[in-house]
Amino acid sequence: MAIRQLMAGTLAAALLLSGCGSPRGGETGSAPADSASPQTQTTDTQKTDAAVQEEQTQPLAGVMICLDPGHGITSASTTERVSPLSQETKPAYVSGAEGEGQTEEELNLAVAELTRAQLEARGAQVVMTRQSHEATVSNQERARMANDAHVDLCIRIHADDAESGQPSGMSMQVPSGSLLGTPAIEQPSAQAAQIILQAVTQETGAQNRGLTPRSDLTGFNWSEVPCILLEMGFLSNTEENARLQTQEYRQKIAVGIADGVCQWKQSMESSQNRE
């Protein structure tokens, strides 16, 4: 599905969508009753019913998503350009945060695998930038993997950290600023982030901390496709870190992400139908 061609939709309408794979209304394309035989009508009805059933069970058929579990274990200390528009460099690999009993890279990978299962069960194709604890590709290379696959959306999965143990909740970081190699991704990324963050916080009950524009992230600046970064919670918060270690809560995050992707897809289709 050419999702990126449908990005002109309004966010307000998108947030009204709550289903995942609800059948769209409209004409069935069958012939008028006075010109079709009973057999033809039955066949057309069967085809329509089959299409509706497929849409309900596979609402993300034709959609391709890149899941990027942040960080990973590595001893590499190389740097890379932060943007195709700048000579400034940053570390190509970053270790990530650490909470009591878990590291961020472990959490990110575990949730990404659960999310992959949710998305594939709904018909989506999924590209993973990392499937082991080792980091074998840099931040720039992760972006290129999504670009080369021509995915409809890249979702970067991370966890937050703070000096104080007080902050909690989920947020989305979105691409912004003059270093974006593909400025056209800014608006559709923000639209997707808003919808998916709403779905995840609704599913988990976590505080919605909103969107944070970022102009300094290599993965955003090299991206040619809509890209968002989910901060699942604070490992520095004792209670939230404990929740993030449970399979039940991780599964809720995965379900919330998949629900959000369904709602995002519906919002894009709704926008196209209004044009």
Predicted regions and their residues:
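C-terminal motif of bacterial Sec signal peptides marking the signal peptidase cleavage site
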Residues: 16-19
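N-terminal, intrinsically disordered, polar/charged segments of Gram-positive cell-envelope systems
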Residues: 24-64
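Solvent-exposed loop/turn segments at secondary-structure junctions
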Residues: 71-74, 104, 132-136, 159-164, ...
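A short, glycine/acidic-enriched catalytic loop
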Residues: 78-99, 162-189, 195
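Mature extracellular/periplasmic domains of secretome proteins
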Residues: 139-152, 217-223
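Active-site-adjacent mobile loop/cap segments within catalytic or ligand-binding domains
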Residues: 156-164, 173, 208-275
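Active-site-adjacent substrate-binding region
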Residues: 187-213
